[in-house]
């Protein structure tokens, strides 16, 4: 599947974390959600795209295993994210920390 997104040709970093209640979140550390400091784009099965505070999620959710994030990765690929690069942690490019 060829990507039609503006970032086509670039790898999109994604960090998968698992909350204590079992929900898995995909964080896109290089895709800002708004101009607010620390707010990045995220994706979950329920709610789908939304804002997330990157540092808060890292502090409250643990790294997800491949088995835990597999379904969410498949869902992301099915909606056009064909260029994902799974990383454990990343420093958002647009946040001065």
What is each PLM-predicted segment?
Residues 2-13:
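Negatively charged, low-complexity tracts enriched in Asp/Glu with abundant Ser/Thr
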Residues 12-21:
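A short beta-strand micro-motif
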Residues 21-31:
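Short, solvent-exposed loop/hinge segments that bridge or flank secondary-structure elements
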Residues 29-70:
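Acidic, low-complexity, intrinsically disordered interaction modules
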């Amino acid at each position: 599947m060829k990507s039609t997104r503006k970032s086509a040709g670039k790898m999109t970093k994604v960090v998968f974390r698992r909350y204590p209640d079992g929900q898995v979140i995909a964080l896109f550390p290089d895709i800002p959600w708004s101009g607010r400091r620390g707010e990045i784009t995220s994706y979950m099965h329920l709610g789908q795209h939304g804002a997330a505070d990157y540092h808060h999620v890292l502090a409250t959710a643990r790294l997800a295993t491949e088995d835990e994030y597999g379904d969410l990765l498949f869902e992301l690929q099915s909606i056009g994210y064909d260029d994902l690069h799974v990383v454990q942690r990343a420093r958002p490019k647009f946040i001065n920390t």
